[in-house]
């Protein structure tokens, strides 16, 4: 039971939000596991398919500031709903695309929708849970999101191989549409009786605020930690993944899928441990990073 008394409602709000986020991760990782099938469908090479992911991640990064401004203005509920529907639209376009240019547009849409998800879920935590639970739940949110990578191996790839590229992907799109309905029905930006936190900055103030945030030591530390520690796993999961293990290393698809899932399981185990240590020793976060 949470200390603030919101109990099951808080867990429901968070659970629905993190379900949508996990599906976003599943779609994000889909080409990392189905790169060979994508290359066959579009009549190209896995190297070209990896450029889809580069474009997607670049879009994801560039969308962070505008998405953050929209999140401040409209709240998590609308951003999660909109992000999930944009992801579904992008994946539906990818499923029905026959040429590379349309596929690139589809991945741009996925990057935009994906950018709406994680921060929107995190924004719910301090409104619904006691402060001492937020660090652990932030890690658990990322941990549950890693289930999306496992779902990409265990669901997306088998569906594509069994039913074909278009039908397999469209089935995964249906899950995201269902998630959007759940978010709209159950997620609320604040508990009953509390006004949602709305921040509306004048447009002219935005560059100054971005500069101020960018110059803050905590922001710079977080940036360089993610920059140096995350690139290898991101490159593997979202760009090379199973095609590299199958074609480059000669593993069977089952062996490659097992190794792919192992990376996600390892992060799921480590996440809550790091979150708990961060909550207990907030002034030792830099030591934990090192």
PLM regions: where:
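Juxtamembrane intracellular "pre-TM" segments in multi-pass secondary transporters
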Residues: 1-7, 190-223
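Helix-breaking motifs and short loop linkers at transmembrane-helix boundaries and internal kinks
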Residues: 43, 75, 96-102, 130, ...
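Extracytoplasmic gate region of multi-pass secondary transporters
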Residues: 31-32, 217-261, 268-271
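Helix-to-loop junctions at the C-terminal end of transmembrane segments
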Residues: 63-75, 270-283
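Cytoplasmic helix-loop-helix junction between adjacent transmembrane helices
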Residues: 106-145
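Conserved MFS/SLC helix-loop-helix module at the cytosolic interface between two early adjacent transmembrane helices
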Residues: 62-100
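Residue-level signature of mid-helix packing/kink "hotspots" within the transmembrane helices
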Residues: 29, 57-65, 149-150, 264-272
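Helix-loop-helix hairpin linking two adjacent transmembrane segments in secondary transporters
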Residues: 141-189
